[in-house]
Amino acid sequence: DVYKRQAAAIAQEQTNGNGLGDIGLSANYRLFGERGWRPETVLTAGVTAPTGRAPYGLDWKVIERDDDDYIRFAVPKEQPTGNGVWQANVGLSMVKTADPAILFANLGYVHSFPRGFNDIDSNPDTVNPGDVKLGGSVYFGAGVAFAFNERTSLSLSFSDRISARASTRFQGGQWMKVIGSDANAASLNLGVTYALNQHTTLVTLLGIGLTPDAPDFTLAFKIPYML
């Protein structure tokens, strides 16, 4: 009973992370306008830079050690704010008017580029440099939107992102798959879009996770600008 109480107390340690996350930049190009049965189709391409705190080489806070100095429990002093690698994405978005509703769907792929780090070991007592390669991700979604007036619309959609396993390679070693790093993150989304002017809109999006890999909920704000 004493041991169980000690273990429970150790598990209550809490850390957080503040700071700049990964910065992304994307551009859209309209391939086709809506005509007859054909939806408006937009090509999207973008890149994400690893400007946030990477989840590798973090400083650790050791909470408990055994009598032989073996670490029983440790947590990062600060949580990561990014994934640590460069990423590029390409996708298609389609919109079709079905008065009074608007139907939309999207499909895309995210590619992650390998990157080296001074330490990729999860043991705070060791330093092992190496490379990390995140698995590619396929994302897709579909939904419907209703316009309240010329400026405001409400949308309801489903989105999913399926990611392959990541791989790591210690310096001088071979690539090895990371067990449990694959994911299937699906969510139900509720959004409100408000047109600020002819070129700029404000998008508010609330997401509710549907799978274990998805966050319980997310809240995002975007301000797209159209030339």
Which residue ranges define each predicted feature?
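Short loop/turn motifs that connect adjacent beta-strands in outer-membrane beta-barrel proteins
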Residues: F32-T41, A54-G57, P100-A101, R151, ...
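Transmembrane beta-barrel domains of outer membrane proteins
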Residues: N28-R30, G91-T97, A145, T193, ...
